[in-house]
């Protein structure tokens, strides 16, 4: 049975005022509508603290990627506001690193050159030797030093995603936005890169917002998990989607993949999220 006091599940209605005051990222009443009568989602509000890792889970079409694109400055909401570090987000910025499911590497450049391109965009006046040292540091963090002078066509899918992650970290953004970055990878590669990401985030204290469909991935990586529902027709008319519930992850932050299943709160937490996806993931 779900234990609210132990697993600290909070409904959106009971917002935490103290968190909103001190939060690094603040989303206020975000809505997106392609048709005025049927918004994809509405009244989406949540926060992220500096150094926090937050995952969002929901079925396809609920608007997760749209929210991430708004946070990245790549799309505009129909209404609402996004504030990061006290300033409203307006357009793309190197202060926010983005990693998509597709690697988006420039095929004619090597790993070194792909990441150096991003570094030079961030710091145009950085001397070439320093750029090279900087690039090598972040390539090493994702375990690709041996492939640094290879082109994308010479890399596996997992290696390409590692390059994308290294590139995002190399510009030292204030926030990292991940849109299902491991969704196209096999289970073994996905697990390996998840572990690498977890260690890098812990070492750098990076703030991360990540979309995933993988419940275990969210439980492993996230401090909090946002459960998002789809818009739906109801007897009272159409109700748009939104954030239905915010779940605080009660598991210790030093959790590991191998030890996850042995933690007392793992199965109650997992069962609650799965139950939401199966029975409550549409607006009522």
Model features per residue range: what roles?
Residues 109-118:
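Short coil-to-helix segment of the ABC ATPase nucleotide-binding domain corresponding to the Q-loop/switch region
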Residues 176-179:
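Catalytic Walker B motif of ABC-type/P-loop ATPase nucleotide-binding domains
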Residues 72:
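Helix-to-loop junction immediately C-terminal to a conserved catalytic motif
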Residues 127-147, 199:
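Conserved ABC ATPase "signature" region
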Residues 150-153, 171:
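Conserved signature/switch motifs of ABC ATPase nucleotide-binding domains
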Residues 80-92:
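Conserved ABC transporter NBD signature motif
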Residues 57-59:
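The feature captures the beta-strand-to-loop junction immediately N-terminal to the Walker
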């Amino acid at each position: 049975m779900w234990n609210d006091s132990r697993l600290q599940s909070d409904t959106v209605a009971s917002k935490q005022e103290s968190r909103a005051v001190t939060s690094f990222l603040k989303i206020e009443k975000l809505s997106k509508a392609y048709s005025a009568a049927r918004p994809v989602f509405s009244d989406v509000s949540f926060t992220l603290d500096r150094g926090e890792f937050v995952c969002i889970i929901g079925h396809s079409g609920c608007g997760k990627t749209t929210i991430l694109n708004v946070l990245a400055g790549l799309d505009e909401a129909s209404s609402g506001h996004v504030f990061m570090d006290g300033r409203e987000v307006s357009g793309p910025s190197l202060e926010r690193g983005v990693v998509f499911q597709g690697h988006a590497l420039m095929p004619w450049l090597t790993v070194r050159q792909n990441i150096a391109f991003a570094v030079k965009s961030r710091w145009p006046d950085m001397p070439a030797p320093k750029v090279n040292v900087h690039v090598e540091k972040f390539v090493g963090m994702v375990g690709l030093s041996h492939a640094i002078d290879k082109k994308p066509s010479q890399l596996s899918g997992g290696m390409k995603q590692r390059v994308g992650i290294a590139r995002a970290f190399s510009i030292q953004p204030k926030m990292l936005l991940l849109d299902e970055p491991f969704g196209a990878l096999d289970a073994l590669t996905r697990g390996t890169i998840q572990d690498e990401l977890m260690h890098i985030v812990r070492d750098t204290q990076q703030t991360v917002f990540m979309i995933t469909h993988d419940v275990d991935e969210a439980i492993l990586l996230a401090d909090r998990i946002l459960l998002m529902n789809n818009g739906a027709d109801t007897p009272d008319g159409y109700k748009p989607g939104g954030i239905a519930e915010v779940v605080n992850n009660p598991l210790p932050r030093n959790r590991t993949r191998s030890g996850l299943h042995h933690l007392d709160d793992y199965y109650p937490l997992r069962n609650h999220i799965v139950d939401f996806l199966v029975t409550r993931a549409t607006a009522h």
